Amino acid sequence: MSVETERSSTESSAASGLDFEDTALTLRLPGSLAAAAAPDPDRKRSSPSSSDAADAADNSSPLAAAADAPPAPKARVVGWPPVRSFRKNALAAKFVKVAVDGAPYLRKVDLEAYSGYDQLLRALQDKFFSHFTIRKFADDERKLVDAVNGTEYVPTYEDKDGDWMLVGDVPWKMFVETCQRLRLMKSSEAVNLAPRAAQ
């Protein structure tokens, strides 16, 4: 039976045009010649200086020099790789985390989406609608007040230096550039945070 399998394997290899040497696993690159990949063990290596001189003589023609030159760098196509619009918008946005004293969760707010402090306060009221309402006081000041127990909350922010400041102390653009995160503190805890103008 083994004779029959050998015949069938040789017949199939003859039919496909491949013999054992073509399909054998070796350490040479596919398609390279077997004689070039397997040097004769009795043959001595040539010295590198003599082979360099022979290569230099062969490369004297301009066609050979052009073939050995590295390929020119490819020009980068404008707009490639494609960047999705939501990634572009995400890079342009300035998200900061908002923490509320007594709330076990944080929210994120995009400061670039608002044009002033009033819009930011309304957005904070919307984010934490179960907690706060905005009340106007006699001196035309708006404050966030807890709807359940009447506790006042003061919006504060951490700047790039790590200092906690009151929201509204600086112009809006400067606030957007320097704000790292927001915190709505109870007004009783925010006593030490005085406006810069008062200091």
UniProtKB/Swiss-Prot annotation:
Belongs to the Aux/IAA family. Aux/IAA proteins are short-lived transcriptional factors that function as repressors of early auxin response genes at low auxin concentrations. This is Auxin-responsive protein IAA1. PROSITE patterns: PB1. Highly expressed in flowers. Expressed at low levels in roots and shoots. A motif (EAR-like (transcriptional repression)) lies at residues 25-29. It comes from the Eukaryota. The gene is IAA1. Residues 31-74 are annotated as: Disordered.
